């Protein structure tokens, strides 16, 4: 079972959907930054852009690492990262290609469909 997290930039809300691994199999080979149709996730009319994700073992995807598997790379801490400037650290990251070992995919809505993502809450009668 995999999870997709869909961010709505207009409202600032995120929506979480659980999907089967066979749907992830249909997305195999796509990269971070690719746009996909929302019909994969029962959201007709929507267009979604892949912004990141993580593998089954928790390693995050990195946009500028063009492989499908994991790799240990040396990163430098600079602005926006904790630590002193100039400190380098070897970390394990996953490449930007979606594979069958993905457990979470992060997406953002680029085109909206006819139906809203949030289901309207039913009015309960007073008791």
UniProtKB/Swiss-Prot annotation:
Fetch the InterPro entries from UniProt.
Answer: Ribosomal_eS6, Ribosomal_eS6_arc
Keyword Ribosomal protein found: yes
**CC annotations in GO:** ribonucleoprotein complex; ribosome
Which superkingdom does the taxonomy of this entry point to?
Answer: Archaea
Select a single GO molecular function from the record's annotations and give it. structural constituent of ribosome
Q: Which UniProt keywords apply?
A: Ribonucleoprotein, Ribosomal protein
Q: List the disulfide bonds.
A: none
One Gene Ontology term from the biological process aspect of the record: translation
Q: Which NCBIfam families has this protein been placed in?
A: PRK04290.1-3 (NF003294)
Quote the PANTHER family the UniProt record gives: 40S RIBOSOMAL PROTEIN S6
Family assignment? Belongs to the eukaryotic ribosomal protein eS6 family.
Its recorded name reads Small ribosomal subunit protein eS6
Q: Which organism is it from?
A: Picrophilus torridus (strain ATCC 700027 / DSM 9790 / JCM 10055 / NBRC 100828 / KAW 2/3)
């Amino acid at each position: 079972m995999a999870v997709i997290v869909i961010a709505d930039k207009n409202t600032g809300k995120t929506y979480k959907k659980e999907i089967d691994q066979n749907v992830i199999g249909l997305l195999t080979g796509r990269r971070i930054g690719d746009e996909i149709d929302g019909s994969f996730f029962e959201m007709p009319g929507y267009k979604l852009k892949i912004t990141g994700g993580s593998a089954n073992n928790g390693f995050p995807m990195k946009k500028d690492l063009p492989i499908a598997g994991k790799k240990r790379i040396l990163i430098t801490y600079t602005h926006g990262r904790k630590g002193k400037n100039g400190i380098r650290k070897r970390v394990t990251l996953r490449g930007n290609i979606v594979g069958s070992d993905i457990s979470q995919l992060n997406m953002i809505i680029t085109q909206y469909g006819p139906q809203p993502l949030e289901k309207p809450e039913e009015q309960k009668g007073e008791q």
